[in-house]
Every structure is written in C-alpha cells, then in structure tokens.
Amino acid sequence: MAPSLRNFNFFHRFSTFLVFSLFSVVSSDDLQVLLKLKSSFADSNLAVFDSWKLNSGIGPCSFIGVTCNSRGNVTEIDLSRRGLSGNFPFDSVCEIQSLEKLSLGFNSLSGIIPSDLKNCTSLKYLDLGNNLFSGAFPEFSSLNQLQFLYLNNSAFSGVFPWKSLRNATSLVVLSLGDNPFDATADFPVEVVSLKKLSWLYLSNCSIAGKIPPAIGDLTELRNLEISDSGLTGEIPSEISKLTNLWQLELYNNSLTGKLPTGFGNLKNLTYLDASTNLLQGDLSELRSLTNLVSLQMFENEFSGEIPLEFGEFKDLVNLSLYTNKLTGSLPQGLGSLADFDFIDASENLLTGPIPPDMCKNGKMKALLLLQNNLTGSIPESYANCLTLQRFRVSENNLNGTVPAGLWGLPKLEIIDIEMNNFEGPITADIKNGKMLGALYLGFNKLSDELPEEIGDTESLTKVELNNNRFTGKIPSSIGKLKGLSSLKMQSNGFSGEIPDSIGSCSMLSDVNMAQNSISGEIPHTLGSLPTLNALNLSDNKLSGRIPESLSSLRLSLLDLSNNRLSGRIPLSLSSYNGSFNGNPGLCSTTIKSFNRCINPSRSHGDTRVFVLCIVFGLLILLASLVFFLYLKKTEKKEGRSLKHESWSIKSFRKMSFTEDDIIDSIKEENLIGRGGCGDVYRVVLGDGKEVAVKHIRCSSTQKNFSSAMPILTEREGRSKEFETEVQTLSSIRHLNVVKLYCSITSDDSSLLVYEYLPNGSLWDMLHSCKKSNLGWETRYDIALGAAKGLEYLHHGYERPVIHRDVKSSNILLDEFLKPRIADFGLAKILQASNGGPESTHVVAGTYGYIAPAEYGYASKVTEKCDVYSFGVVLMELVTGKKPIEAEFGESKDIVNWVSNNLKSKESVMEIVDKKIGEMYREDAVKMLRIAIICTARLPGLRPTMRSVVQMIEDAEPCRLMGIVISKESDVKVKEIS
C-alpha cells in the first residue's frame, strides 16, 4: 500500500474516532442533566419519564419530550401538560448549552425561578405559562435570541424586568398576562420597541397609563390583548396602522373618548372587545369591519344608532352591546346572512321591532334584549329556533301572544318576558321544555289556567308568574318540580286549594301566592320543606287552622294576613308580628292584638273531649308500639340481607376500616345532617377514630322516604351526584378540601367515606343555635383557608373544577377551626377549550349565593360563579348576617344590603358584626372590600380565586404576637424596593 494511501486511511479513522468521541461527550453531559431532571420528580411517578433510562441505547434523543439536532445535542425539552409539580431544576437544565426550546406550560410547577435561567443563552422558545410559581421573574437580558416568551397565568409577582426586553429584539410572541405584577406607572416603552411582535398578551398584569402612539409601529401584530388593566386616556389614532390585526382586546379598562378616526382601516379584525370602558360617540367606524365574527362593546357610553351594515356581515355570530345609550332600531337584517349565535343589546334606548331572522340558519343560542323600548310582538320564527337556550326580552313595550312553540323549545333554559304587555296563555307545549330552568313572566296580561303539563318541565327552578291575569286552580303537577326554589304567583286570579303536592318541592326557598282567591286550608306539607325561607299567602280566602308543621320552618318572612283563618296561632310562630292580621277567627295566648284562646279545661263538654283525646292517644301509642316492634324485626332481616349483599370498595387513602365497619353504622341514630345531594352519618370506628359517611341520593329516582323505611334502600343505578363527587374528590389532595377515604358501592347503594369534622360548618358557627363568638383572627383564617381550597380547585388542575354550590354550610371546620371545602355533588370539571366549556341548563347553587344576573349574561357556568358565592360567604363573616334576612327588604339579599350601606365610613362600620373587636374593625372592612369585588354583577369583573387569595393575604390583620417584628419587616421590604 502506498504511504500516501496509508496516511489517508489513518487520518480518516482518527477523524471518525474524534467525532464519535465528541458526540459521546456531548450526549453524556446532556444525558446526566436529563437524568438529574428526572430525579427531581422521582416522587411523582409520571409516565413521561418511563423512557428516560440510562440503558435506552440511543441516548437522550429517544426520551419522550426531548428533541436533538443532527449532532446529537439536546435542543428541545417539551414537558408541557405532563402533570409536573414542585420545583423545576433550572440550574442544571441551563447547563445544556444547545437548548433552544424549553416548554413547561400547563403544569403545577411552583417555587421561585432562580437567576440561573439567564444561563440558557441559546433559548429561542420559553414557555412557563399556566403554572403555580411565586415571586418575581428574574432578569433575562442574556436571553437575546428569544423569539417566544410565555409566562402567562403563572402567579408571578413583584416588578417585572421590563428592561430585559431591550435585548429581546427578535421576540415574535410576548405573553405575560394574568400575573399580579407590581403596577406600572406608564405603559412599558420597551414593549413598543419590539418591532417583530405578532402576538402581544398583557391582559390582567397591572399595566397602567395611556396606550402610547408608538403602538402603531408594531405593524406585524395580529393579536393585541391589553384588557383587565389600568389603562386610561383615548385609544390612539395610530392603532389604525395595525392592519394585520385579527384580534383586539381592550376590555375592562378606563379608556375614554371616541373610537379614533381610521379605526375602520382594521379590515382584518375578526374579534373586537372594547367592553367595560368609558368610551363615547357612535359606532360608525365599525361599519366597514366586514370580517367581524365577535363584537363586544358592552358597558360603555356609546350613543347613536347601530350601523345598518351589521345586518349584512356574513360572519358575525356574537354581538354584545348591552348597557350603553344606543338609540334607533336594531338592523332588521341581523342574522339573515350569518350563522348568528348570540346577541345582547340589553339596557339601551332601542326602539322598533325584534329582527325576525336572527335564528334563520338555526344556530342561535341566546337572544337578550331586556330593558329597552322595543315594540311589536315576538316573531313567529323564534318558535322554531331549536338551538335557543336563553330568551330574554323583559322590560320593553312588547305585546301580542307568545308563539306557542317557544314555550317548549327543547334546549331553552330561560324565558324572561316580564314587564311587557303580553297576553294569552302558557300553552301545553311547555311539556317539551325539558331544559327549562326559569320562567320570568311577571307584570304582563297573561291569562287562562296554568297547564297541567308545567309539571313535565323537570328542570324548572324559578317560576315567576306574578301580576298577570291567570285564573283557575294551581295544578297539582307542580309537585313534580323537585328542583323548584322560587315560586311567585302573587297578584293573579288563582282559585281553589293549594295542592298538597307542593310539599314534594323539597328545594323551595321562596313561595309567594298573595293577592289571589285561593281557598281551603294551608297544606301541612309546607312544613316539610327544609329550605323554605319566605312564605307569603296573604290576601286570599284561606280557612281552617294554621298547621303546626309550619313551626319547624326557619322563615325570614311569613305573611298569612287577610285570610279567613281560625283557631290558635302556634306558639312558635307568635314572633312573626303582623303576619296574621286580618284573620278575626284567630286567637293567641301571647299576641295581645288577638282574642285570647279559651282554655278547654273550663268547659265540662271540653273536659269530656279532653278525656276522649287521652284515651285515643293511648290507643295510638299502643298501636305504635306494636308497629315499632314489627319494624325492628323487619330491620334485622334487612340488615341480614345487606350483610350478604355484594359490596365494592374503592380506596383513595390509607384506611384502618372495612366496608362492614361502615355499613353496620348507617343507622338513624347516627344521622347528623342532610346535604344538597345526600344524608350524612357520623361513624365511630373500633379504634375510636371518627369518619363521616354520605349516603348519596339518586337525583333521577329520588322519592320521599319515611324514616321508618330501610335507610339503605334499593336504588335504580348509580346517581350522577355520586359519580361527580367521586370523580372530583378522589384525586384532590389539599389541606383545605375535605379528605375522601373511599367509596363503597353495590347495585343498590352508594356511600362516600370522609374525614369527620367535629366543629360542623361555618353556617353553624355564624347563624345556628350552635353559633360561637368567633374572633376576627379566626374568621380571617377561615376565609383564607377556604379561599385557598377554592383556588386549588380552580387552578390546581389542567382544567378547573367548579364547585357550583359554595356556601357557609359547605365550609366545614376541624377541631382547630381550620376550614375544608365540602359537598361536591354539584361540581363540574370544565371541558377542554375546543369549542368552549360545556354550558349547563341550570345555574346550580343555593338561593342567596347565586348572582341575580347570572342567567342574564353568563352563557356558561364558570369559575366566576364560585367567586361570587365566596364573596357572599365573606360578607357573612364580616357582618354576621345570613345571605337572606327579612331586614334586607323584599327580594333583597346581603349583597344589595351591603351595597346600600357604602355611603360613608360610618355606615360601613355600622354593618360590621358587633362581635368583632374594635381593634379589628378596620381589618374587617378590608375583607368587605374583597367581598364586594367578588360579587361584581358581571362575571368578567370578578377576580380569579388566585387573586382573591392574594388580596386576603394582603389584608392579614396585625396580630398581637410579633407585631413589632412584622412592622419592622414591612419597613425593610420598602427600603429594599
């Protein structure tokens, strides 16, 4: 072989060896870093790391979530949506010098981001969004190759390092929204110097000041979101240069002035939302935005007419203009060319008829035109709108009859036509309205009898028929409405008797049948309604005695005046002064304005009756004893059959008991409460430990069972409440959420076993006979703990868990008065955002804890429903009042009452619970401010629970221990900043 050829072969082999060695070194370094990363999450047992093994043969490039370049260097780590929690080892990961992409979004990572992040100098893509980090985001000037930066919704706080953006001139996406950063005095100038930006998301991150004219220099922008901020001043005319924009979000700021001239140049705009500002002028600049799909301009001060061109937009499906000063008619062509989905033009000065074609293409879900001056009748076309879910046209000047088919639309959830001039009947078509949750028909001229078919609308929760011309009997089928909470029938011409079946409406809280011609006796079944809060049967022709069963109710309002009642006023009801006037046949031993009841023992004839009653009573007692012995025998047989039944137990935590220990203790004497979806029992185990057992009731087959029947009775399958509660609680691990130990099921019964909380509920502590004198520090700790529990539900998962029935009776207290969120029978896990979260046909919850306008403007149940309910709980803690009190007035709740007492500092102090010490009253007012923010009328204005927790932490009272240290600490922080 020639020397030159030998030299070439040697050089070739040496080069190959050298390259292979270098490859091995780089891959080995990267491998060690990745294995260290894996070890950081060793306790999590996550499937994503199963492939991250030392002996995988190919090296780190084969790991799931890892990408390498052609030289074998790790360039990308994508662990988004992988269930990661805890601290992430940024210090070691940033040793990978070739790393260009780090994607960790949609996890539960926590802790403070270390300054080591600046060592990831090759990063082009960084996604830390939707996590649970804390503290400030570190300075990142060295990351000068960044093109994509996602930090949104990750709980960062403090001062954001805006100056670091000066080196990030290649940024295409900047997403910092939904973080409680320290407020800026002005709009950050560093942002408007990023000329390559196509996506800018700065919503809800404490940006303040005016929108700078230089925003017009970002001509590549396609998405601009700066909503939920402190922006002021006018929208600069330079914004018209952003001709590539397809989405512009400016809502919930304090912007003023008119839409700038040239705004119509943004012809690519598809989504525009400038709602909840102080904008004025007309909407004429929008007439040329023909590509609009969604236009949201509600809650401003716009005036003038709605452009006729809106009726010609072919893609417009969502139009929200409510709470402005718009005049003229709605464009009659609205929806005729588009797949119209939603319109809300409520609370304006609109006139003319309702456009007939908004459901022409059969896609419309909501028609909301309440509080205007509309005239004419409801177009017949809407009786065929099978997709319609909400129909609200109250407080207008509409007339005519309601199209028959409208009553029975299959997806309709709410009909609100009150305060108009409608005539005619409710037709039998209503039987087809299986999703119908609310009927608001008050103050019209509707007439005829209520159809018996109204009982077939299984989902009805609110029926308001007041101030109409209805006649005839109240249909007995009303007892089939198991979810009915409010029944208002006052000021009509109803006659006949109140049906006994009303006692089957176990969720009723408000009944008003005043000013009718109802006769007969008051049904004793009304006394079996556990949640009844207000009962008004005044101005009728009722006769007979007042049922003793009413004594068991805890009513804030009772009015039986102006009837034909007779007999004794039950002693326990005598405190309802004025509730019995106009009934000359009534007598009382305690109310002076009534005749004194005659003592039966004074009459010889009555004495005979008295003796007969005793004899008769003894006979009943004897018969009861025989029946009791028979039941005992039956229960033993039942117990023996349960023993041999096939049970399945599914545990979620370490347990020291068996299913037999639980089943043997489900007895009447262990019953401690009835929840929204089941009965609760206290069970003492053999080792002395106590647990709570909930026996879930089937919603679909729920019946009224007597206490004499077997407790674990046959069921038709598993209830949806049981499945919901198990699904929700089995995976939850949080200090402030009640612990679920296991579920126990058979073909016939469903049981859930929880930790037992000995101090009952917050409601008990504040309002019941068990109420305790809670100090402010304890109330504060309860508020903070409950808020953290809800925050975990809303933000601790990839998809939020919505409780849907937050109230003080569902906040349980342990032996140290630490709170736990409980009763998840109504909970809902929001579905993936593809197509939006599922809507629900009825806003679940409890009267007094639900926003009055939730039906009006909330198209779906969201986390903001829980936020409102929690705000009501905070008001209970501060004021000591129940959500509904007689002193608030007719149709008023605690939110109205608090709002009406905000006129001065003195009036605010007056509503703070007198049991709260003087030194803490200012702290209580701080909490009241948070409650007011939480109970904002519009869901969009309510904070997230994450923000609520932060606000409550900021409102921590100065405690007597360590007060000097705390003050010094505060001073030091201020000096450092």
Curated annotation (Swiss-Prot):
Location of the protein in the cell: Membrane
Domain Protein kinase: 666-959
GO cellular component: membrane
Ranges in the topological domain labelled Cytoplasmic: 630-977
GO BP annotations, alphabetical order: innate immune response; protein autophosphorylation; response to oxidative stress; seed germination
Topological domains annotated Extracellular: 29-608
PROSITE patterns hit by this protein: PROTEIN_KINASE_DOM, PROTEIN_KINASE_ST
UniProt keyword annotation of Kinase present: yes
Catalytic activity entry: L-seryl-[protein] + ATP = O-phospho-L-seryl-[protein] + ADP + H(+); L-threonyl-[protein] + ATP = O-phospho-L-threonyl-[protein] + ADP + H(+)
Lineage top rank: taxon: Eukaryota
Annotated positions binding ATP: I672, G673, R674, G675, G676, C677, G678, D679, V680, K694
Disruption phenotype: Slightly delayed seed germination.
Topology term for the membrane: Single-pass membrane protein
Record's keyword terms, sorted: ATP-binding, Glycoprotein, Kinase, Leucine-rich repeat, Membrane, Nucleotide-binding, Plant defense, Receptor, Repeat, Serine/threonine-protein kinase, Signal, Stress response, Transferase, Transmembrane, Transmembrane helix
Gene3D superfamilies listed in its UniProt record: Phosphorylase Kinase, domain 1 (3.30.200.20), Ribonuclease Inhibitor (3.80.10.10), Transferase(Phosphotransferase) domain 1 (1.10.510.10)
LRR repeats: 71-95, 96-119, 121-145, 168-194, 195-218, 219-242, 244-265, 267-289, 290-312, 313-337, 339-361, 362-385, 386-409, 411-433, 434-457, 458-481, 482-505, 507-529, 530-553, 555-578
Catalytic residues (UniProt): D805 (proton acceptor)
Database matches in InterPro entries: Kinase-like_dom_sf, Leu-rich_rpt, LRR_dom_sf, LRR_N_plant-typ, LRR_R13L4/SHOC2-like, Plant_LRR-RLKs, Prot_kinase_dom, Ser/Thr_kinase_AS
E.C. code: 2.7.11.1
Tissue: Expressed in roots, stems and dry seeds. Expressed at junctions between organs, such as the insertion zones of stamens, petals and sepals, the transition zones of floral stem and pedicel, pedicel and silique, and floral stem and cauline leaves.
Transmembrane feature ranges: 609-629
Glycan-carrying positions: N73, N119, N152, N167, N204, N252, N268, N318, N373, N399, N536, N577
Annotated family: Belongs to the protein kinase superfamily. Ser/Thr protein kinase family.
Function in brief: Plays a role in pattern-triggered immunity (PTI) signaling induced by pathogen-associated molecular patterns (PAMPs). Acts as a receptor for PIP1 defense peptide. PIP1 is an endogenous secreted peptide that acts as elicitor of immune response and positive regulator of defense response. Involved in the control of seed germination speed, in tolerance to oxidative stress and in maintaining seed longevity.
Stated name of the protein: Receptor-like protein kinase 7
Species: Arabidopsis thaliana (Mouse-ear cress)
